[in-house]
Amino acid sequence: MVSLSLRGARRTAKDAASLPFLSWTLSLLALNPLLVSAKSAADYYVRSLPGAPEGPLLKMHAGHIEVDPENHGNLFFWHFQNRHIANRQRTVIWLNGGPGCSSMDGALMEVGPYRLKDNSTLEYNEGSWDEFGNLLFVDQPVGTGFSYVNGNQYLHEMDEMAAHFITFLENWFDIFPEYERDDIYIAGESFAGQHIPYIAKAIQERNEKAQMKPKWSLRGLLIGNGWISPKDQYPSYLTFAYEEGLITKDSRTAKNLEVLQSVCESRLEAGKNKIHLDDCEKVLSEMLTKTMDVSKNECINSYDIRLRDEAPACGMNWPPELTHMNYYLRQPELISALNINPEKKSGWMECSNAVSSTFRTQKSVPSVQLLPGLIESGIPILLFSGDKDLICNHVGTEELINNMKWNGGTGFETSPGVWAPRHDWTFEGEPAGIYQYARNLTYVLFYNASHMVPYDLPRQSRDMLDRFMQVDIASIGGSPADSRIDGEKLPQTSVGGHPNSTAAEEQEKKKMKEAEWKAYAKSGEAVLVVVIIGVIVWGFFIWRSRRHHRGYRSVYNKNMSGSSVLERFHSKRSGADMEAGDFDEAELDDLHSPGLDREHYAVGDDSDDEQQHQRQGSRPEGGQS
């Protein structure tokens, strides 16, 4: 009996027997939506990018990874594949600060391969950090930038943030397993100076528990103008202001600020385990107010003291590209290109007040307390500072280092009472800053740089990154820069050009040409081998056919066409000068030569062997059909 299914196809009794299994499978999928909704790397592939420069699009992936299913918490990422591989695969994770400020700042204004030229046009960043490392930008905590979460379920503490980030990495590596064994570096700036050490510690704890899973190879941390040690950073405001001439000592303004400073220091003594202290925030706020130009309604840019901004922003409107960012990242075409989930209802914002006001870290200790343990565990750490930043100035970072104890010493001492020297760094003939190193900690001070060092000095910042990652390569993607420490030329790193720069294009064309010639040479060799084999086979068949022809010609007779087999035999015998009377059965066997038989059937046998060989040759490797 034949019945019809709902889809109108013919279904037999055998098919009907499989229905329970089908129903069970559908029920399983219904109960496990992850089996249906699981995404692959293809779902995150960025196929186009509005305003991208002419030429091939860089290989990118972007989208959301769920980290909090209960509250639909999703972190947004934007990943760029490296342009060149040096001696090993590396992945650099970049985080901006806030808390609650988007890492799209880093992607489009600092270390990413593109910079915004205007509201809708991108241009290449000549100092992008993706030359020797895959770049992964993440908007975190949930609610930051393109990331989102239901309602007001924002995070409060550092351990929550770190747990979300570990979940993000686990899920991200499930989708992109080819990067899980990369050397991992975590970099960022500002309040990321709190995030990064906590994430690093969480990775170490995860690795200790990992049994069947690969351990993540955390190779280093880079923190720029970081908010790491409040007890060292808060008092540095006034010290830095005096050094830079923003405040005149013994002036009325100075005395007012010193009163606030003393209150702050007393709070710090009692609250040394606090990341944020309102009484200390008042010092900077009052400083910006007292140094205002009332006639112009301008105040010091707290991120770059060389600049002024309208009050009360005092730097919040900087850099000027922020105007372009706000427009570009809200375009429907861009939202579609970066695979933004429809659940993300609100438009992109650089910094979220909701995230910042909730993330108060009342139970979290400052990350400076984690640094010694991380360094002693073998993780190299690099702290770098732009010398024109006020809000996270270099004076506070240097004080942090001077007071910190790690690996059997205090600060940069190499032995009791002896400190590691400061080395002068020049880049392409110009003073670039200083380098200082001791016991697995490196400090770099950039001259003429703001809170966002890579924004001001992209090529110098990548030179720093490449040296920290121990990249040593003469010329890939551009001309190597002349970078020197105390006048001594350092190992070459390519920091001069983007893959679409003229030098890089010429280099790529040269490589392609060489590859083409190698391909032609290999093709020529293959063709020659085929021709030789063909000639040999052709010659063999010619020889075989002639031999057969001679054998058959000896029994050929013009008058044999209508004769019987016996008559043909007699004719052959007479043609061979044999007498008819000598005919017997044995002679017939002799004339019916086994050798001739084998030769006759050998042609067919060869053909069969050849067909079998052809079938074997056409089989895909691994036995796949």
Curated annotation (Swiss-Prot):
Intervals, Cytoplasmic compartment: 544-625
What is one Pfam family matched by this protein? Peptidase_S10
Signal peptide location = 1-38
Which residues participate directly in catalysis? S190, D389, H451
Record key words, sorted:
Apoptosis, Carboxypeptidase, Glycoprotein, Golgi apparatus, Hydrolase, Membrane, Protease, Signal, Transmembrane, Transmembrane helix
Bilayer topology annotation: Single-pass type I membrane protein
Biased composition range(s): Polar residues: 491-502
The EC number on file is: 3.4.16.6
**Region of interest (Disordered), ranges:** 479-510, 588-625
One GO molecular-function entry: serine-type carboxypeptidase activity
Q: What is the predominant subcellular site recorded for this chain? A: Golgi
Write out the GO cellular component annotations: membrane; trans-Golgi network
Q: Which residues lie on this side of the membrane: Lumenal?
A: 39-522
Task: Name where it's found.
Answer: Golgi apparatus, trans-Golgi network membrane
What family does the entry list?
Belongs to the peptidase S10 family.
Question: Main role?
Answer: Protease with a carboxypeptidase B-like function involved in the C-terminal processing of the lysine and arginine residues from protein precursors. Promotes cell fusion and is involved in the programmed cell death.
Its recorded name reads Pheromone-processing carboxypeptidase kex1
Native organism is: Aspergillus terreus (strain NIH 2624 / FGSC A1156)
